[in-house]
UniProtKB/Swiss-Prot annotation:
Keyword presence, DNA damage: no
Keywords in alphabetical order: Cytoplasm, Hydrolase, Nucleotide metabolism
Source organism (scientific name): Aquifex aeolicus (strain VF5)
Feature type site, description Important for substrate specificity: 11, 68, 150
UniProt EC number: 3.6.1.9
Annotated protein name in UniProt: dTTP/UTP pyrophosphatase
Protein function: Nucleoside triphosphate pyrophosphatase that hydrolyzes dTTP and UTP. May have a dual role in cell division arrest and in preventing the incorporation of modified nucleotides into cellular nucleic acids.
Family affiliation: Belongs to the Maf family. YhdE subfamily.
Cellular component aspect of the GO annotation: cytoplasm
CDD domains for this protein: Maf
Pfam families linked: Maf (PF02545)
Domain of life, source organism: Bacteria
Gene Ontology biological-process annotations: nucleotide metabolic process
Keyword Transmembrane helix included in the entry's annotation: no
């Protein structure tokens, strides 16, 4: 059966590749509207919309959609709009714990799965110079919360409670269980 990742995120492709299955990438076309104060609900809604938008034209396939949001309290912190926004986001998160939710929706011809995972992340205290230098690197610009835990952003993360891959953008443990249930992981360990 065809497996499609409804995302152009190189991080999600990298994580999905860890499961050793062949897949294709078809970008989802959805308006990413946020429900203010509802980060988990927003992430679940967007993951479902992304998967559904691709599945509608590929009903014979298994389509994987995901959405990652960073939040502080109930304030959703999305991708930075520009460098100034990235600096402000990183200042806000400096020295604090925040949460990362990645929602996952899998459409198959037989069944729809919708789940999410949450991890807590603590930044170390960041100097203004560190923030500006990191933003100038360009790494934060396409990432929720303005950092990439798998890149140089790892140097600003002091601690993670939860799954690293949830923070990176795809909850691999939950996805693994779904794909096993769909019998798409033949030959992997049991």
């Amino acid at each position: 059966m065809r497996v499609i990742l409804a995302s152009t995120s190189p991080r999600r492709s990298q994580i999905l590749s860890l499961l050793g299955i062949e897949f294709e990438v078809i970008p989802a076309k959805v308006e990413e509207e946020v429900i203010p104060g509802k980060p988990v609900l927003t992430a679940r809604k967007l993951a479902k919309e992304k998967a559904l938008s691709v599945w509608r034209e590929n009903r014979d396939a298994v389509v994987i959609g995901a959405d990652t949001l960073v939040f502080l309290g109930n304030e959703i912190i999305g991708k930075p709009k520009d460098e100034k926004d990235a600096v402000n986001i990183l200042k806000k998160l400096s020295g604090k714990w925040h949460s990362v939710v990645t929602a996952l929706c899998v459409y198959s011809p037989e069944k729809v799965f919708l789940t999410h995972d949450i991890a807590k992340v603590k930044f170390r205290e960041l100097s203004k110079e560190e923030i500006i230098s990191y933003v100038k690197s360009g790494e934060p610009m396409d990432k929720a919360g303005a950092y990439g835990v798998q890149g140089f952003g790892a140097t600003i993360v002091e601690r993670i409670h939860g799954n690293f891959y949830t923070v990176m953008g795809l909850p691999i443990v939950k996805l693994y269980k779904i794909l096993r249930e769909l019998n798409l992981l033949a030959g992997t360990f049991s």
